Amino acid sequence: MGLAMEHGGSYARAGGSSRGCWYYLRYFFLFVSLIQFLIILGLVLFMVYGNVHVSTESNLQATERRAEGLYSQLLGLTASQSNLTKELNFTTRAKDAIMQMWLNARRDLDRINASFRQCQGDRVIYTNNQRYMAAIILSEKQCRDQFKDMNKSCDALLFMLNQKVKTLEVEIAKEKTICTKDKESVLLNKRVAEEQLVECVKTRELQHQERQLAKEQLQKVQALCLPLDKDKFEMDLRNLWRDSIIPRSLDNLGYNLYHPLGSELASIRRACDHMPSLMSSKVEELARSLRADIERVARENSDLQRQKLEAQQGLRASQEAKQKVEKEAQAREAKLQAECSRQTQLALEEKAVLRKERDNLAKELEEKKREAEQLRMELAIRNSALDTCIKTKSQPMMPVSRPMGPVPNPQPIDPASLEEFKRKILESQRPPAGIPVAPSSG
């Protein structure tokens, strides 16, 4: 006779309070007492309401039968009690084993819950890190795009600067050509002016010599013409004529009509008498022509003096123009050289600045790539840890599942926290001293 175990009974609950053998014996004796009470009650009722004399034998037989039944029930209950005792001992041992298993499972559950909580915290950290990594990847992408754009703009600016340099070189070559031509023309003008100056100097010397000669001749003429007096000259001529041999010879000649010169003597004498006046008129004409020549020479001298002054003024003007042109050419050449030097210096400075910016951007991109590589390594480690945690949680022997709260919504990324995260990652991934760091392939 076995002990029936119902759903929800005392044996169906695992982890209930410990119940000893007396607990079940108490119920057994209760049932036995109840049966005895019922028997006694039946006997009392039979004795009160039944026919004792008639039914004594039958009642006795029935009582014997009931006693036998009760005895058999007692034997069955005794056997059942022994079976129950055995089962109780077995159940106690099973209970102890189950309790031990429950304690082990509880410890495993606590350990798994702690691991799950740690995994949940790691999952939250991993989620936050994913946000940071997404922000870093986006910033790296933006930096790469900006670097490409800046490379394009730098190339375009460099090409434009090269074009400007070429244009400036062409303009400088043109200006140098123009300056060379201007310089050659100025040198040619200078040479022509010098030749003209030499010619002017020669002409001036010749004119000076001619002037000196004219002055000397004028002085001689003036020295000769100043003491000349017409009346005195005529008187002197007459006296000279009277004192000369010609009148005396004419007076000594006779008037022979038959002489070949007789008829001519009167005319000759008259001609000789008029000779002083004729000589005076000739001398006067000569003096007038001499005065005219002197006036003409004076006018020519004044004209030459004026031409000399004009030539000197022209020479001074040409020298001033030459100096002015030379100064302008030198100033323009200096200005062009200064402008060319300034443009070249500006182009070199802009080129150096652009090269420096490109190097800085390349270094920054290299740092971003290194950080991204480190974050990828950290992400791989976190992923492997999370997979291990999930596999551990998904294993059996999890009697109690404690639901965790929902993952908090991600907050907007703070730049300061992002920089702090980068610093922590770099510090965590920084190798110890003496160990070389392998260069990243990115």
UniProtKB/Swiss-Prot annotation:
Residues 49-442 are extracellular. Residues 1-27 are cytoplasmic. It is a single-pass type II membrane protein. Residues 319-328 have a biased composition (Basic and acidic residues). Glycans are attached at N83, N89, N113, N151. It comes from the Eukaryota. Endothelial cell-specific membrane protein involved in the formation of the diaphragms that bridge endothelial fenestrae. It is also required for the formation of stomata of caveolae and transendothelial channels. Functions in microvascular permeability, endothelial fenestrae contributing to the passage of water and solutes and regulating transcellular versus paracellular flow in different organs. Plays a specific role in embryonic development. Homodimer. It is linked to Diarrhea 10, protein-losing enteropathy type: An autosomal recessive, congenital diarrheal disorder characterized by intractable secretory diarrhea with massive protein loss due to leaky fenestrated capillaries, severe hypoalbuminemia, hypogammaglobulinemia, hypertriglyceridemia, and electrolyte abnormalities. Disease severity is variable and death in infancy may occur in severe cases. Some patients show facial dysmorphic features, and cardiac and renal abnormalities. This is Plasmalemma vesicle-associated protein. It comes from Homo sapiens (Human).
